[in-house]
Curated annotation (Swiss-Prot):
Pathways per UniProt: Secondary metabolite biosynthesis
Region (Enoyl reductase (ER) domain): 570-815
Family of this protein: Belongs to the fungal fatty acid synthetase subunit beta family.
Reactions listed under catalytic activity: acetyl-CoA + n malonyl-CoA + 2n NADPH + 4n H(+) = a long-chain-acyl-CoA + n CoA + n CO2 + 2n NADP(+); holo-[ACP] + acetyl-CoA = acetyl-[ACP] + CoA; holo-[ACP] + malonyl-CoA = malonyl-[ACP] + CoA; a (3R)-hydroxyacyl-[ACP] = a (2E)-enoyl-[ACP] + H2O
Name of the protein: Fatty acid synthase beta subunit pigK
UniProt xrefs under Pfam families: Acyl_transf_1 (PF00698), Fas1-AflB-like_hel (PF08354), FAS1_DH_region (PF13452), FAS1_thioest_ins (PF22235), FAS_meander (PF17951), FAS_N (PF17828), MaoC_dehydratas (PF01575), SAT (PF16073)
Keyword vocabulary terms for this entry: Hydrolase, Lyase, Multifunctional enzyme, NAD, NADP, Oxidoreductase, Pigment, Transferase
Enzyme Commission no: 2.3.1.86, 3.1.2.14, 2.3.1.39, 4.2.1.59
PANTHER family: FATTY ACID SYNTHASE SUBUNIT BETA, MALONYL COA-ACYL CARRIER PROTEIN TRANSACYLASE
UniProt note: phenotype after gene disruption: Leads to the accumulation of pyran intermediates devoid of the medium-chain fatty acyl moiety such as monascusone A.
Biotechnological utility: As colorants, MonAzPs are widely used in various food products for centuries. Moreover, MonAzPs also possess wide-ranging biological activities such as antibacterial activity, preventing hypertension, lowering cholesterol levels, causing hypolipidemic effects, and displaying antiobesity and antitumor activities.
Amino acid sequence: MEASDQSQAKLTLSFGGIQHAFSVPIEDLSALQDQKDAFLRSRSQASLSETREPCSPAELMLDYLEFLSCRNLPPPLTKPVLLAFSRNFLHNTEIHSLLAKPEYTPQTRRRLVRTYYMAALSAAESHVKESALLDAARQGNFQLAAVFGGQSTANPACVRELAELFAAYTPFLGDLISTAAPTLSALCRLPETKEHFCGRHIDIETWLHDPASIPDGDFIATAPVSCPVVGLLNLAHYAVTCHVLGKTPGELRSHLQGVTGHSQGIVAAVAISLSDSWESFYEAARMTVETLFWIGFECHQRSPRTSVSLDQVQDSLQNGHGRPSCMLSIVGLSRAHIQDILLKLNRSLPEDEQVYLALDNARDSFVVAGPSCSLVHLHTYLRSLKADASIDQTRIPHSLRKPTVQHQFLPISVPFHTPYLQEAARAIKERLFPWRVVSGKLTIPVYDNRTGNDLRKSDNVNLIHTMVDSICWEPCSWPAALGIENISHIVAFGSGGVGELAMRLKDGQGVRVIIGSEFQSRDEEIGTKADLFSPTLLASSTIVGSWGERFRPRLSKSPTGEVKIETKLSRLLDTPPLMVAGMTPTTAAWDFVSAITNAGYHVELAGGGYYDMDAMAVAVKKLVASIPPGRGITCNVIYASPQTLSGQVTLLRRLSSQGLPIDGLTIGAGIPSLEVVSEYIQALGLRHISLKPGSITAIREVIEIAKAHPDFPIILQWTGGRGGGHHSFEDFHAPILRTYGALRRCSNIILVAGSGFGGSEDTYPYLSGTWSAQYGLPAMPFDGILLGSRIMVAKEAHTSPAAKRLITEASGVSDSDWEKTYQEATGGVITVVSEMGQPIHKIATRGVLFWAEMDKTIFSLPRTKRVPELLKRRDYIIKRLNADFAKPWFGQNSKGEPVDLSEMTYIEVLRRLVALMYVSHQSRWIDPSYMTLLMDVSVRILERFSIVDELDDALVLREPHRFVENIVRLCPPAAHDILSPEDVAWFLLRCKARGQKPVNFIPALDDDFETFFKKDSLWQSEDVDALIDQDAGRCCILHGPVAAQYSQDRDEPAKEILDGITQSWIDMIRHDFYPGGVTPSSDSGSLSSESWSVLTPDLTSRDESALLDIIPEMQAYCPSISSLGRSGSPWIHALLSDEFILQGRDRRPNPCRRVFHFGPGGSLQFDRAKSEITVSMENHAGNRSVMRIVCENGADISVDLQQPSAYTDEMVSLPLKFQYDPGMVPVGISEVMEGRNERIKSFYSKVWFGEDICRGMNARSVFHGSEMALTEAMHRDLLSTVSLAYPHSETALSGVDVFPISVGMFPVWDAMARPLVVNDIDGDLLRLVHESNTFEYCEASTPLRVGDVVSSTAAVRAVYIEDAGKHVVVEASIERSGKPVMKVVSTFLFKGVFNDWNSTFKTNKEPELVLDVQSDLDELVLRDREWLLLHDPSQSLVGCSLLFRLETQVTWKNRNTYRSLDVSGLVFLQQASDDLKEIGAVAFHAGECVGNPVLSFLQRKGSPATSPTPLTSPGWPGVSSLEVQLPTSNEMYTRTSRDYNPIHVSPLFSQWADLPGTITQGMYTSAISAAVLEHLALNGDRRRFRRFSARFTDMVLPGDRLLVNVKHVGSIQGRMLFNVSAFKQATNNMVLEAEAELEQPPTAFFFTGQGSQKPNMGMDLYNSSPVAKAIWDEADKYIFETYGWSILDIVKNNPKTLTIHFRGKHGRKIRANYLSMENKTVTPDGQIVKKPILPGLTDQTQSYTFTEPSGLLFFSTFAQPSIVVMEKATFEDMRSKGLIPQSAVFAGHSLGEYGALLAFSGFMSVRNLVDLVFYRGLSMQFAMERDERGETNFGMVAASPQRVGKSDAVFTESHLRSLVQMISIASHELLEMVNLNIENEQYVCAGTDTETQLLLEEMSTTEDRTTTKLYKLILKSIPATKKLPMPIRLQRGRCTIPIPGIDVPFHSSYLRSTVSSYRKILQQYISEEDVHLERLVGRWIPNVTAKPFMADEGYVREVFNITQSPILKEMLEL
């Protein structure tokens, strides 16, 4: 019933996260609802130990059903729930299949099965479903046999197993138990038996109903108990099967072709054959248990009784071998081996203690029986015989290994199947006299477990006797019992692993084993209860073909009539199943690999022959270019060489990404981890991977890898130990015999045999599988054969003729003798140990025999003992090296005598290098790196002897002997001076340099001797000319000892060798498998990595329905696909199913195939008449893209992709052309490349710009964008589009009219994208990637705002080629009002492989570089550069800092070489004022060259002019990350940005471009990320955003969630430097990384004046900052040289006195400097008087002393320069760290104004400013009249009006001004307010000491603010103040603070007379050209005006009004 039925209602169960609703009748709903509530309450209240959480809705419902059943409710209430359960969960299955899932525990399964069947029987509902397995048997499709188990390791648990079975199937077993239990109970209570049982009776019913009462396992395991119980258990399983299937025992039996049993299982087998009804079954059951009872009892009583010591028992138990018993299982030895052991053992035993081979279970599995004491002896012997599990035997030759044996005592109390029980058998027969079974009563065959004969044909009148004998004393042969012919399935009943025993025997014979007593199986090919009961045929129930049938080779005929061999390997590779292995050096030669490939065979390029990745890349590319288009290549790499492997895998990944067909990777010398293999599979785009295991353990590792990648082909190449080259110690056959079944269970493993092969006769048995017959096993075919050594003598092989002769002279050996090579040369081959420490087979040449000798005598020693032994045998070893080995001893003097390296002269070294590395008679170097070695040694020699000369590279290449003689001429001492120890060490180190070919000599007998001896030892076999005397007997030649017997012909082409073998195979296959001579036709084609696993070996033609399997999900919404699949057109088949197409020689994924995988929203139409396919797809916005495919002639395919235009109502078409060629394999479709990229560019031009390509434009053109108004709508659209990604849209919105910096792309897009479609930049726009984007505001420009009208231009700055493809860099400029406002730079990448170097160029404005010329040598080196053109060559540059502003223009010839190089630019002198003075130019031009010598020099000698300063602790104090989510469509950004690239909006185009979806524009991701930075770091103030440079690192799709992180990482040029990164949250992959520059918040810099000084100021920075230290040191040096004192001493120590001495030349110069400093004063009569600035100083003064009680740092003369220098040092340190914003405003307080101007405007040098302020300090200090104490009676005090009087009264600036004026007027002395610092808070007053003291007193005491009273108080106080003793020491008051160290009334009218003279001093120091108005205007805030400085008349007038300056008056013409 359906839930919609009005008579039904929903009932919902919900518990523990599981919920299920089902329908019940309405009338039962209320009652069931109540029961449900009670059920859920009971579950909630139950403890965890009482109940289990349901794991599925089915379990929850069965739990509910169990609850209902336990409450004894009437069946009508339970039945609706049962029916609902069956309806919902058992519609197409049954209960066992449902519960077979691994989430159910065995206990849960039993409980749920019991619940189900109890409920079904209670409700009288049928539970029976027709078994699909039995139905197939009934129809004759399957042939079933049943087997029953016997005694086993499960004996102790047999009763418990029976109890568990009874608990699950109680309703089905009641009758059987009630039949058997009383029988057994009575038998064990008989007088003759009760003494044995002694009250422990066999009480089955008690045990079943109360499992806790079951006795211990030892008792149960005894034969009297276990024998009948095991028999009962067998019958119980059979009975359950009958009941579940609803059949009688006879009906089930009728489906069986026969039965048998293992040991005592034969009794159950006979019982089944006798049973045709339930009555006869129960009668047979009674007979079975009684027979087995007496067998167990009598055998137990009559077994030999022996004792085993307690120690022996404990030893056996502790080692996991079980308790010693009468039967011992042995696995791992052959029958003959065991019989031999038993024969020897029994000779030492008395007759009554001998042991016998009791059971033969399998080829290497047996059971020996006898007295336990004797079996303990056997057990002990086996332990000594077998291999220790902890010892690795993989490096021991197979024949010398100890066998791997498993032996276990069985819990069986009697020695069944031995003569010891013959008497027992007679007694048993007497006991069973009433029972009689004659053969005629057997209704189906019962197969004797001794002979395999059908017992129906037995001559024995009573089969009871036959069974007794077969169990008691006759040996059991399980192989004979299972030798049942013509069966497809074996159903096993019972425990003890009888099913696994059957599987072990029948594996590979085409027999499926089903264990009818288990829910689960450890082997996926073994069926279970589910297979037995399922109403549908399960995969594990089907017929499984024999290995011989499934994997044998087949023949097929191609459409051309060619007969081909088909195996799994041939289908995968589309080649014959004969391949050539990767061999170094043989298949390292690309041309040889090409020859084999072009012959039609698979071969591996040997990566082991390449140490240089560039050379390997060249080889791969040449190989690809030389083989048929589309044919893939496979590279062989060596896992044991990790560094080389890493480089080669990286290279192959790069080449694969470029489209080169890297189909396969073969990994030798080790099995990588699963993770590594997975990475290779994913990263390299492989179609298959080959692994070469060397042991059983390694084979199992490969199996695990294959299981982890079940859909990916894994080729397992097995070579064993007999292979040529590196090999294992394994026997060839044994490991495969043990693992073949496991290998074939992995359908994706392709098994290839290699080693020892050379012809068709020796290889065919392995291809057909008959090789295994000699081991008594079923056929075990390999999928392919691997040839290696045999191919080394092929005509095309590079093996030298002399080496080929040595190969053919080697006789080789048979498979049985190859292990002798470990000890000696055998068949001309010997094993040595390679550099990797692995055994390796080589032809036994003199050199290799010496190698073997060294392995035994030297390399076998511990490493610490090797060198002493080498030195001990030095002369012998050197002699052998020089006489016999490929690598001679290097040391040799000019007389030809062997010497050590340290005894050679430098020239002898050079001559020896040339002699060994240069093949003189062929005028060639062995390797280019050897030439480099000679050059390096030569340079070292010249350096050693200080010779400066250029070496002639060309001469080294052409005539190295002349080159060496030139060295002798240049450096005569080198001919007789021996090498210094340093040069000896250097030479040895240089010989080991990475990246060069290993040296071909032995330079020393040291720790590296083995490396020098063994490394790179194989190449000479292909270059005998490079050997001394061209002696091939010196070299190493890889070859296999077995294969050597086939290597005879030295002139046979590889194709003939391979074709000969293949053709012979075809003849043999036809003879063996096609007796009729008919060969089926085939067009099955090649096997792809996706579809190969569904193809069976029987496939001989392409199944059209397989096409639909490729895209099954489409049929639901696209019925047209069915008609397309049935079209029968080969070209359509290819479009749908071919994995790749060809583009030229590059293989690309088939785009049509991808497009056909469209989802909902797509449609397909097929017009058969027109041969036209139309696919249409709609995107989120409802826009539809179309693909139209037409092929009228079956060969020429036209594909038209159509996209809606943004400019018109018409579609824009992209026409693409393809050709189909069925004869081109494995890739049948190729794209027509002529004009392709031009057609794509035309399409994009129309999509992007609404017009076709402008033919007049090229890559060097300037592209103009249209003028654009930045409107409010544009502003709103951009912000709205970006805000879509934010969790709260207001995050990205802002009320200001400033555009985000990302708007820069909008005005320039038109101009920037147009270069991408010009014809001279070749590339596929469908593969275009936007790599990076940079937006940068121009200096001093303001951000773009609403209302701006802008224009743009763009130009291509670079077109260059890298591994990833062709990069195009476009730079655009945005102008506003004719001025540049922003620069936008984008880098685009055309993915692919390009060689059009003529189109490449790059124009680059280099970062500015600064070069400090610090010495004469620096200047000399610089002037020597020809490219430097100085305007004034006579000008000295020492001490100068030069700034280089350069532009580089290059074109390329190839990846590493420029075709042309031009460097031009200007050179500037950096002046102290930060001004730049042009002093020269750079002009450099070169043709073909490598590198940029100009930049190389400047980068090496100089440094960047600006560089970022990193933060020590990067981060951000606030929120530093934000999660965003991309909109589900890119439509809105596409419209806003006008980037109409269809890959962003069209599913059809994105699929065609092989993208995972409509990828989001990088510009959009960039805009979002920039907005996040605005939000988090700028609080939305985007005016401070100056630069954003983003690189796009991964694709982003609509809907992706990104986490955007921001980090403050440093500063640059006053801006904050941020890193921004965005990560996909789902994968944690970075999708964007960016760098941003933000202006700091508006900042003002304030410089303090005098009074701020303190000791040690700036010294911390002096000690930590090189920049600050340099300024202090410069000032200190200058002051000391000029004025005789140290500013550092003043600051650090603050001395109270300082004496400057004027003695000596330097002293006199200092005195003259002081004398030149004068003060000019005006006398009362108007005369100008000049006085020395230091009072009393004359030209005779010998010294002068300065004194200050507070310390000279508080003396104006020293304080002022100290403060200014400190400020300058601090500022420059900040500037060097990029902390000074370029727009910052600045001001200085009093003296600080000098520091501010010096820092920001650079209006004079530090030296000049020191002069100026020192003069200022002196002039002010000594302009005052002083008394005899040096006092001036003047001071300055800071006053705070706010602190005056009571808090409720107000004392303001005006009050203070009035007070100061009143004091001055009243006293007639100076007191003025001179500094207005903080309004109403701080002012500074200057005046006489008495006036300032009076001010202090009045401000501290006054309460009355009235002028009259205040004036009176002042008048009253003056007399007392004037009477104070002098000098007056001002004290700090409540409102005033005296300024210490200042006794000059600065800024007061008292000093007005000094202004004129000081103005003149300033005019001397400040030159007009040093004043930069742009640094001052708007930024400098002068003291005088307290307003930003402006250079206009109004500002000048304002200053004049304040200062009355005559200069300004003149300027204003007043």
